[in-house]
A protein has these predicted regions:
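Short gly/pro/ser/thr-enriched loop/turn and capping motifs at secondary-structure boundaries
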Residues: 55, 138-143, 224-226
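Cofactor-binding active-site loop characterized by glycine-rich and histidine/acidic residues
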Residues: 2-133, 146-156, 170
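Short, well-ordered beta-to-alpha junction loops that form the rim of enzyme active sites
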Residues: 50-52, 219-222
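Conserved small/polar residues in nucleotide/adenosyl-binding loops
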Residues: 250-256
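Gly/Ser/Thr-rich active-site loops/lids in small-molecule metabolic enzymes
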Residues: 235-249
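Short, conserved beta-strand edge motifs with alternating hydrophobic and charged residues
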Residues: 135, 190-192, 216-220
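Conserved thiamine diphosphate
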Residues: 7-10, 99-100, 149-210
Length: 256
């Protein structure tokens, strides 16, 4: 069904609001805003945020940038916490104690997803919980000082893999987490970029949220501090990432 993304943005309320403390030029806030806009207006959402840039900058008690329910979890626990929340919701719904439609969405950075939280993510996906896990991937542990993660590209310069005379940056290749999630035989897996093709991000978010069962979105979200670009260059950095095939637009449904 054809539609105009500009009309969607204009007519749907923002569930990720202004007033957060994310850095200027960060790719994560516009990605989170568009993902949350993919929800139907009448549906409620429970969001779990793993400790990281997005959580510490958008949910500082008593302030929040989220209009839906939000759970702050430890670095490694977003998928586990949300899977338990979803299971409790399903139980209460079967008992007739609640009737509203609630969607469950987890957000974690690449450090909390590729590395520290991979075990709980794999478990939640394998068990078949009806939830979406979103990895906002900026290629390193940016919140704690730009340390390398398994999402960091080979030869990238970080504080724990400094490019210089001894080593030319990170020596290991980047982990293909999207392919790992595909191997879990999920009903929907997608990869995209957070700030350039909003139509692609919106459509993939909508499919992930409204496909029954566990789904996964891997969204590249550049970081001006870690990547070293001027804050007004976010759009150009995203375009370069696509043009140079650093990130690819991919998605896979269970029947494909």
């Amino acid at each position: 069904m054809p539609y105009n993304v500009k009309e969607i943005v204009a007519n749907k309320p923002s569930r990720f609001t202004a007033g957060h403390r994310m850095c200027a030029g960060c790719g994560a806030p516009p990605a989170a805003r568009m993902i949350m806009r993919a929800l139907k207006p009448e549906d409620h959402a429970v969001v779990a945020g793993a400790t990281g840039c997005m959580e510490v900058s958008t949910f500082i008690y008593p302030y929040t940038a989220w209009t839906d329910s939000f759970i702050h979890t430890a670095f490694e626990c977003a998928a586990a916490t949300l899977s338990g929340t979803e299971a409790a919701y399903q139980s209460l719904k079967k008992q007739g104690k609640i009737s509203n439609t609630t969607k469950f969405i987890a957000f974690g950075g690449d450090g909390g997803t590729y590395d520290i939280g991979l075990q709980s993510l794999s478990g939640a996906m394998e068990r078949g919980h009806d939830m979406v896990y979103v990895c906002y991937d900026n290629g390193a542990y940016m919140n704690t000082g730009i340390q390398r993660s398994s999402a960091t590209p080979k030869f990238a310069d970080t504080t724990t893999s400094p490019a210089g005379k001894v080593i030319p940056g990170k020596m290991q290749s980047r982990k293909d987490l999207t392919k790992i999630m595909v191997s879990h035989h999920l009903p929907y897996v997608a990869q995209t970029i957070g700030y350039m093709n909003f139509k692609d991000l919106y459509e993939k978010s909508e499919k992930a949220i409204y496909t029954e069962g566990p789904t996964f979105l891997n969204v590249m979200t550049p970081c001006p501090r870690g990547w070293g670009y001027p804050t007004d260059m976010l759009m150009q950095i995203n375009k370069l990432a696509v043009d140079t095939c650093s990130v690819s637009y991919t998605h896979l449904r269970a029947h494909e």
